[in-house]
Design a protein with these regions (language model features):
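Short Lys/Arg-rich basic patches
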Residues: 1-9
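Intrinsically disordered, low-complexity basic tails/linkers immediately adjacent to helix-turn-helix/homeobox/MYB/SANT
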Residues: 54-62, 114-137
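Short, solvent-exposed alpha-helical "recognition" segments
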Residues: 40-44, 97-112
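Short alpha-helical "recognition helix" segments of helix-turn-helix
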Residues: 20, 84-87
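Short amphipathic alpha-helical segments
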Residues: 7, 17, 24-37
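Short, basic interhelical loop/turn and adjoining N-cap
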Residues: 26-27, 87-98
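Short, amphipathic alpha-helical "recognition" segments used to contact nucleic acids or chromatin
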Residues: 64-79
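Short, Lys/Arg-enriched anionic-surface-contact patches
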Residues: 1, 42-66
């Protein structure tokens, strides 16, 4: 169960929160909770930002367009080498290290995103194979 917390907002902040929540189809308290959680995560991991996408809200490297799960999956694909992953992704090793630091704290979340991506890839492969089979028959 969540803890109750009362907060006074500066003039205009509540109105902007209300408008943003309405546009996002969320309750104000849900959006405020998300902002607090993501703000705390960003304070601890300043090279990580949070963005919306087809699979929902996710952690990504600031100004890079790479999700944390993509960096972690690439490290795994390179036998755990952060240097090789950085070279493959064409990003500084420091950004790979930032993704690894975030992963260390939110491993279950990132592993779940990797699993979802792998499942989606397999569905796509199966659909492509079925399409190729249909073309041959």
């Amino acid at each position: 169960m969540a803890d109750h917390y009362t907060l006074r907002l500066a003039p205009g902040v509540r109105q902007r929160l209300s408008e943003r929540a309405r546009r996002a189809g969320l309750q104000e308290r849900t959006l405020a909770q998300r902002y607090v959680e993501e703000g705390l995560r960003h304070d601890a991991h300043p090279l990580i930002q949070f963005i919306d996408g087809p699979s929902g809200r996710r952690a990504s490297l600031l100004s890079r367009g790479l999700d944390v799960w993509e960096v972690i999956a690439t490290i795994r694909d390179n036998n755990g080498s952060m240097a090789e992953a950085a070279e493959y992704l064409q990003i500084p090793t420091g950004l790979v290290e930032a993704a690894v630091a975030y992963y260390g704290e939110y491993r279950d979340e990132i592993d779940r995103e990797i699993e979802l991506n792998e499942a989606e890839y397999e569905r796509g492969r199966a659909a492509a194979a079925a399409g190729e089979q249909a073309l041959r028959s």
